[in-house]
Amino acid sequence: MTGVQTCALPIFILLATGVFLALYYVPSQVQVTYNGSYAPLQGQRVTEAFAKTIDLSFDVRGGLLMRQMHHWACNIFVGAIVVHMARVFFTGAFRKPRELNWSIGNTLLTLAIVNGFLGYSLPDDLVSGTGLRIAYSILLAVPGVGTYLAFWIFGGNFPGEIVLSRFLILHALVIPGIILAMVGAHLFLLVRQKHTQFPGPGRTENNVVGSPMFPVFMGKTTGFFFLVAGVTALLSAFVQINPIWLFGPYDAAKISYAVQPDFYMGFLDGALRIAPAWQTVAFGHNIPWEVTFPALILPGLIFGLAYVWPALERKITGDNEIHHLLDRPSQVPIRTASGAAVLALTVVLFIASSTDVIANFLHISLNTILVVMRVLTVIVPPIAFYVTMKICQELRDVDNASRRKTPNMVSRTAEGEYVAVPAPHHEDDAHHEESPIHVPAFISETSNVDESSGTRTVER
């Protein structure tokens, strides 16, 4: 299965379950008395949005399953985009002529993260309300225009009265429409440019080897869709996610423990947790760097670097050629090491989003954990870069990364010294084979279709 399939298929699950949820959800922050079937909350004053979400979970047939499928599909969708983009980056599939598609993929990832956060905020429970409060503070931290921006989006001071209605419009209509349009553009460019491929028998820069669209590719895609839907349904049925009835309604005076955001927001939460207190005053405006840097500057640097990387690599290497064959990651050490460093940084920040759990589990002061995570944030990415660079250089120095090195055997000289000498090569001994056996190609460059394998070669 291609990465595009993996990324696109959860969209259909999100759309189907989202329509179901929209039939019952009410984005109202008006206080009502809950009288539903969930006994611990009966008689409490909650927002109508929270009450309707609880009703959807306990009083609507199949409602909880739909909620969980929607949530799990969102996580699968974002995770698939991340994995797909990592594959594209490490193999160099973003190079000319696919720079535009790379930018579209970056934009899709950004929109998916933003839309996931908007949907996560709609139930108005304690955790999502806390996330909204953090988002409001991040908007306030924008230098110069933060106050105006926060008031414009929230319709006034936090929590406001119309923010959920606005978020629902963005979450259910505006951003999904943009995502669908960009997925369509992504697929159009993919069909027009054809897919990339690793070097191999019969594969050149001027042709493309793969399965025909119909029936092979469409059959695989249909089967894979049902596989994704089945896995999502099983996860939703047996693995609980976002149990808002346990969190309760949002209350600014309450906090929660051992509750982290979805994984795609973990790096941002971790960065905010470990950022040291640091503020400056410039032109009469207070700049809270403990919020501005981890929540605005750092994500901007990461995503900005992703956008400009194709042009940056082209400028540094002077490579302006068109590429349809992929690189082995080991053949481009700088690129691979840079990607590994960024991934290491996000992993460390993701772990930092659980500082409270780590401190409690290890019985260590929270302040100590914060200091340790700050140090790791600084030293782990360079270490990851250096180690990855050395590994790639070692693999690149070998003529073929998959070739076995010539084995040695230990021999004793007449003087009693032990030395390593190359072992004798035996043609009939696979253990001493210096290079892998070439498996016959499914197709040859002179034939278009191999009926036995269903593969096809076409000119670009």
Language-model region placement:
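Short, small-residue-biased leader/transition segments that mark boundaries at the very start
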Residues: 2-9
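Long, contiguous internal "core" modules enriched in hydrophobic/ aromatic residues
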Residues: 165-166, 170-174, 178-258
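Transmembrane-helix bundle segments that line or gate the permeation/cavity pathway
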Residues: 11, 20-30, 72-95, 102-103, ...
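Extracytosolic (periplasmic/ER-lumenal) interhelical loops and adjacent juxtamembrane/interface segments
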Residues: 23-67, 132-160, 251-280
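Contiguous transmembrane helix-bundle modules in multi-pass membrane proteins
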Residues: 301-302, 309-327, 333-421
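Individual transmembrane alpha-helix segments
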Residues: 60-72, 156-177, 274-300
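Juxtamembrane/interface segments at transmembrane-helix termini
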Residues: 21-31, 119-129, 187-199, 234-250, ...
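Extramembrane terminal tails and long inter-domain/linker segments of multi-pass membrane proteins
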Residues: 1, 41, 194-222, 318-329, ...
